[in-house]
């Protein structure tokens, strides 16, 4: 048997709750393991070989609680596994510095703890916890727009020789300066900005690539996303969306031989609809021309559980980061980032990235 992969997560929201509850779902339903998992094994690591040993958050109602309790705390809304049947764990949730991680629309829901600790004090506490728990990989599920908070955690990884999986659109693995830092320290980093398993952007970029490869010319396209969880509420703050829009747009543009002009493509989150909860709706349109310059168009409506979409990809990102550690690889893990993330340092087609 392989040793457990020791993981800490930053941002104990719906995405993490979906990851934990999903693993427990497969524990309780082993016959379902063929459904929803890209790779049952990656170099002998299964989805059951991940041990979440610590978590970090800013919410006063989560800090100090055990992992199995915190994933059900407000404003989390994933409820695939009843709380009373979720196995207990000794792993705790510890305080993380808020920095820019709490937007104006969500601060009344998240209610950040006011401990009065200075960032230097928290940083020391965090590094001590990481050492005590033997963390090998940190996964960042910070909210969109958490630029300074993401950099804080990236630096913590560099200081403690811990691999970093960056699920959010704050550019670390795809930033040349940060990529060089991880390369120089020989620490793996997988990022940035997780693709959904069958999400809005992966569907959009796949169809864009199909149209491109079939010899048609795309003239304009849009993708509009709406949802009802804290992620979409946070994204009502337009100033937090700069990196997100870049990430999603470049993910689609990278699949075209000739990128579209900026005024011919729109890809981005659009609004918060409370009653949708964790359901995300995507509306996509492509307009183009084919043989004999004849016009065509297509429209797609996609309805998905936003957090199942994330967890099905992160489960591979963690295992691939561990394999990189086992093999002594450092810096951006190119193929893993290209296949699993929207904004890798090097874009590839999805089939090429999967086989790289």
Regions found by a protein language model. Give the residues of each.
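Catalytic cores and adjacent flexible loops of soluble metabolic enzymes
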Residues: 9, 52, 137, 182, ...
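Active-site-lining helix/loop region of Rossmann-like oxidoreductase modules
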Residues: 10, 48, 62, 73-77, ...
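Short acidic, glycine/serine/threonine-rich loops at helix termini
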Residues: 20-22, 65-68, 152, 176-178, ...
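Phosphate-binding loop/pocket of nucleotide- and phosphate-handling active sites
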Residues: 326-356
